[in-house]
UniProtKB/Swiss-Prot annotation:
Function: Functions as an intracellular leucine sensor that negatively regulates the mTORC1 signaling pathway through the GATOR complex. In absence of leucine, binds the GATOR subcomplex GATOR2 and prevents mTORC1 signaling. Binding of leucine to SESN2 disrupts its interaction with GATOR2 thereby activating the TORC1 signaling pathway. This stress-inducible metabolic regulator also plays a role in protection against oxidative and genotoxic stresses. May negatively regulate protein translation in response to endoplasmic reticulum stress, via mTORC1.
Lineage of origin: Eukaryota, Metazoa, Chordata, Craniata, Vertebrata
Glycyl lysine isopeptide (Lys-Gly) (interchain with G-Cter in ubiquitin) crosslink, residue number(s): 166
Family stated for the protein in its record: Belongs to the sestrin family.
One family name in Pfam for this protein: PA26
Cystine pairs: none
Record: residues binding L-leucine: 365-368, 377, 442
In-chain residues carrying the UniProt-annotated modification N-acetylmethionine: 1
Catalytic activity line of the entry: a hydroperoxide + L-cysteinyl-[protein] = S-hydroxy-L-cysteinyl-[protein] + an alcohol
GO biological process: cellular oxidant detoxification; cellular response to L-leucine; cellular response to leucine starvation; cellular response to oxidative stress; DNA damage response, signal transduction by p53 class mediator; negative regulation of cell growth; negative regulation of TORC1 signaling; negative regulation of translation in response to endoplasmic reticulum stress
Protein name: Sestrin-2
Organism of derivation: Bos taurus
């Protein structure tokens, strides 16, 4: 995204975020102010900004000459960011079926579902820069009927994508004055899922607004004590709790090694056992929720005006005492065999870039864990990806979900589910309490997996509905 210039910021002063995404904590003035409320400024600025400059060149990112905070944090993983940036530019800046101002308005609608003031403010500025009608920023009721018709599918994609049916697609494509073409709808659906998942990344990494153009520091939430806010280094292992952290890492690595050996020896569970373990994991995910003392985010009226049915949110795919929708068997509609080919037919420019971005996140590895190097992390990355798909009701027949419980600690599960399903409830405490002994860049890596797995899950449901509509 592009940071608004000073003129646009002044014009949108009432809309732009001013105190960061962690709305439920007190603020104190600190300096220098970094791009994240969760990550020490010296770590993210040094590694993130340097990585971006080396791999892409700062001028390739921003015509304004400024790099936003999201890009700097994501720049901790420059190989992934390259793929992300290509798709982001295609969706929002390259010629396509939808006018540029419409794309930014759709992005506003998507980000508002999660009350993500960082993204809403950024896209408001870009909406005006691309010639958008300022009246539309007063709320959905001032936008064209054609855009308002996206509200229902925006709501479902953001919170319960498994409810999307071919009837939702038919209603949008039905011939009429305010109908969508299939090419327009595909671009809109990809953009909606892109922004929903990007909101997860913003909240999951504690991304802060850029501040005023003069660069004066804005209020920032106080950092917790250093032993909580920064994962221990090798030296800190000599301090209280350090040996316990080291043992946790060693235990995780041993479980990973055992799983990899069993896979090589073909000691996998039977199909019935794997299905049973998926159902167990899905049921147990009901218990993986944020603490009851987490307050509901304050509903910002400047964002609620872009939202219809604001009380609609994520509900567990399997709920006690209710008739659950059928499990989405990944083998019946895969990204590789079905989703990708459909996107390639209807939105060829986006299909290849989407696939590259998914692969960049899924395969990204530095073969390190905390203070250890030369580690094969494939089973851990797969467990995180498949757990995210599990909470969205997607099952892989060839995956043993017993691995999820062996590799993902409860604090990590709580964090993953919160960031993926209701990111606006994410807190610094959640971020600090999983993988305390890991580097911040490794936690950002988890957020990249979250972003892409969530986006792919929602897209699979939407593309399956389109396929059913077309057949």
């Amino acid at each position: 995204m592009i940071v608004a210039d000073s003129e646009c910021r002044a014009e949108l002063k009432g809309y732009l975020p001013g105190a960061g995404e962690e709305q439920r904590e007190s603020r104190v003035r600190r300096g220098p102010r970094g791009p994240s409320a969760f990550i020490p400024v010296e770590e993210v600025l040094q590694e993130g900004a340097e990585s971006l400059e080396q791999h892409l060149g700062l001028e390739a990112l921003m015509s304004s000459g400024r790099v936003d905070n999201l890009a700097v944090v994501m720049g901790l993983h420059p190989d992934y960011f390259t793929s992300f940036w290509r798709l982001h530019c295609l969706l929002l800046h390259t010629d396509g079926p939808l006018a540029n101002s419409w794309r930014h308005y759709i992005a506003i609608m998507a980000a508002a579902r999660h009350q993500c003031s960082y993204l809403v403010g950024s896209h408001m500025a870009e909406f005006l820069q691309t010639g958008g009608d300022p009246e539309w920023l007063l709320g959905l009721h001032r936008a064209p009927e054609k855009l308002r018709k996206l509200s229902e599918i925006n709501k479902l994609l953001a919170h319960r994508p498994w409810l999307i049916t071919k009837e939702h697609i038919q209603a949008l494509l039905k011939t009429g004055e305010h109908s969508w073409s299939l090419a327009e709808l595909i671009q809109a659906l990809v953009l909606l899922t892109h922004c929903h998942s990007l909101a997860s990344f913003v909240f999951g990494c504690g991304i802060l607004p850029e501040g005023d153009p003069e660069g004066s520091p804005a209020p920032q939430a106080p950092s917790p004590p250093s032993e909580q806010s920064t994962p221990p280094s090798r030296d800190s292992l000599n301090h209280s709790g350090g040996f316990e952290a080291a043992r946790d890492v060693e235990a995780l690595m041993e479980r990973m090694r055992q799983l990899q050996e069993s896979l090589l020896q073909d000691e996998g569970a039977s199909q019935e056992e794997m299905e049973s373990r998926f159902e167990l994991e899905k049921s147990e995910s009901l218990l993986v929720t944020p603490s009851v003392d987490i307050l509901e985010p304050f509903a910002n009226p400047d964002m609620l005006c872009f939202v219809e049915d604001p009380t609609f949110g994520y509900e567990d795919f399997t709920r006690r005492g209710t008739q659950a929708p059928p499990t989405f068997r990944a083998q019946d509609y895969t990204w590789e065999d079905h989703g990708y080919s459909l996107i390639q037919r209807l939105y060829p420019e986006g299909g290849q870039l989407l696939d590259e971005k998914f692969q960049a996140a899924y395969s990204l590895t530095y073969n390190t864990i905390a203070m250890h190097s030369g580690v094969d992390t494939s089973v851990l990355r797969r467990a995180i990806w498949n757990y995210i798909h599990c909470v969205f009701g997607i099952r892989y027949d060839d995956y043993d979900y017993g691995e999820v419980n062996q590799l993902l600690e409860r604090n990590l599960k709580v964090y993953i589910k919160t960031v993926a399903c209701y990111p606006e409830k994410t807190t610094r405490r959640m971020y600090n309490h999983f993988w305390r002994h890991f580097r911040h860049s490794e936690k950002v890596h988890v957020n990249l997996l979250l972003l892409e797995a969530r986006m792919q899950a929602a897209l699979l449901y939407a593309l399956r509905a389109i396929t059913r509509y077309m057949t």
